[in-house]
Amino acid sequence: MHRKIGRAQPQATPLTKQLLNQLLSNCDNSLRGLRNEVLLRLGYETMRRRSELCAFKFEDICKGANGKPAIRLNFSKTDQFGTGKILPISQELFDLLEKWRRMISDEGYILRSINRHGHIGSNLHPASISILLKALQKDLKVDSDEKPLSGHSFRVGAALDLLEQGEPLERIMLRGGWQTDSSAINYLRNWSM
């Protein structure tokens, strides 16, 4: 719609490492707290879209060719044939995923819904990610002028952090799964030099 009427699409609020650390400081060892920590770390480290995050299963956790922790992305918006891709993750996230697996004592989807009684449901719906991020942001009691976080906040924030660290555009594109320079640059457009 924005393209049709000549307006730029609004940029998602970046969930940068700094904001990630603030949000993580509010995650406790409760069922919800641990699930939220998994969501935050998995979203930031993998730079995946909401639907892709919700599709990860425990069986997708693996070791990369270099023997380091990784997770397999089986299908994505830019991989419609399901060729798959191995995404590196930190040892910290790998250990957290194992802790989460033991806590919910189940296989299947990693990100799960949790009802008000603390019962673990099936896989989390992609729309729930934005709702959870907004709630986590509200719990921080950050400035009300701050735009709410959304599902794309992981991708924007992590891409901006990589750029700040001096990573070349090609490497950022590989991490984020962008196939064209223009797509990646669109996520980096609010970068201030």
Can you describe what each PLM-predicted range is?
Residues L20, R35-E37, P126, S130, ...:
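Short, leucine-enriched amphipathic alpha-helices that occur as contiguous helical runs
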Residues L23, L39, M47, L73, ...:
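Mobile genetic element proteins and their domesticated derivatives, centered on retroelements
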Residues G64-I120, I131-L140:
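Basic, alpha-helical nucleic-acid-contacting "clamp/cap" segments
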